[in-house]
Amino acid sequence: MPPKRPDADRFAYADAARLLRETLDALLPPTRISVAEHAARHRWVRASSGAHLERYDHTTAPYLRGPMEALTEHGIETVAIVGPAASGKTAGPAESWLLQTVHADPADVLWFMHTSDAVEAYVKSRIEPMLEAHAKLIGDLRYGRDSVAMKRFRGGRVEFLPFTASSLINKHVQRIIADEYDAYDPALGDPIQLLNPRRQAAGADSRLLAISHPDLGVPITMPPERQRGIMRLYANSDRRTWWWPCPHCGAFSSPNPGTARRMLLDYPEDAPLDAVEQEARLLCPVNGCVIEDGHRHAMNVAGRWVCAGESIDEDGHVTGAPVFSRTAGFW
């Protein structure tokens, strides 16, 4: 009885044609394309209404383009994104970076979340559907059988892990995603001090993306050493803030605390919560214009990030030089 042919799905190099193709591909340099550009060209996402897929559109959440660009920006080793829940900071930059890594710039990746349950839920609900939706793009790059915790691709692998002491042992990669950074067990110590050695061997080619709601932060006016969690990373970064124009007078201001011209919410303080939600408005700090929520999308499309060390005038002109930091911080 002749021996059975090896299962190509289990043994990546059982197929001679595949072996030859991948050997030749390995000699080619990685495609130089930013995460933002890759998402615009190649990524598909589920439509907000209906079950069909549509092209990733940067105008949906324009403020996420900056963090995506920073992931391939020369001289940047860490990207810290501070923001509220459900603002797209994981679905946008993190997932797009994963897809760009697999398709265009292979490397080993560690993706940490705060618990095993969170890892399993996220991989099953977000990562696996994303990979399946891009089968035509990356199908030939996937290797055999994988699991919730491990996805193998040509030129690299992605491990999805809870942030625990055992998960950090003997892990050395080029890229790390630290999701829900402020939810990590504080008994383990400062997360960045535990994560940096995991990418030390990659040197300046390493990248770490940290994402979180600022649950551990103290007021931004406090010195960096007093900050904790994601806000400590931000305080030691180039501290980029988001600026957008008033839809009525055109003057640029920022919703971020501590900025020179801060746009605030105006609402009836003693009213019931339902009334507050209905009546809350933004106030332009330059001319006092009342801004309805319906203008926010157009304001974001026209918005931009401004680094510490730079100044932006009311007309949107930026002057000055950004402070030097190998961490790009977005808040």
Spans of features found by a protein language model:
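Phosphate/NTP-binding elements of NTP-utilizing enzymes
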Residues: 2-331
